[in-house]
Amino acid sequence: MSEELIRRYSITGSRRFSNYWWSSVIFLGASGFLLTGLSSYLNVNLLPFIHAENIIFFPQGLVMCFYGILGLIFSVYLGLTIFWSVGSGFNEFNKKDGLVRIFRWGFPGKNRRIDLSYALTDVEAIRVELQEGINPRRTIYLCVKGNREIPVTRIGQPMSLEEVETQAAELAKFLQIDLFLK
């Protein structure tokens, strides 16, 4: 009974394998750059496979330290977005209460919880945007009164055309509203 009245789609957000992978790779690479730069400054081999006497501190060692620090900062930033689960949440379409609820986690602070609620009567249509090319975009939007369009698909790896079509059609049928393609 509740399945007929409530649909809930979970959104993964930043806790994707690719983010774990890139955070780890950037951390290892940046650590290597920083240790190599410090090795050239101290004239001590901090890494067993690097010969510090072959690297002059100014300018090569200094630049390597700079890139290492930048990489570590970026790696920590990516790690924190994973830890805080930024972008994850759910889309809930509730016929029982007559509400559409879009919930996402943001960065810590005053607006950490992004919680949008709309009456089902305010939802006018479902719009699908398909853009092919080098960076394809396949997005489903919820069109709400007041010319607002709220994306309800996940960010990251684009969904297949079949997945987009199926999810948009199911949602439009469930909400009994129009579906159009841009």
Curated annotation (Swiss-Prot):
Provide the primary localization. plastid
* Segments traversing the membrane: 22-42, 63-83
Please give, as recorded in its UniProt entry, the membrane topology of this protein: Multi-pass membrane protein
Q: Does the keyword Transmembrane apply?
A: yes
Keyword Iron in annotation? no
* A GO term from the CC aspect: chloroplast thylakoid membrane
Q: What is this protein called?
A: Photosystem I assembly protein Ycf4
Q: Which organism is it from?
A: Oltmannsiellopsis viridis (Marine flagellate)
Query: Its encoding gene is what?
Result: ycf4
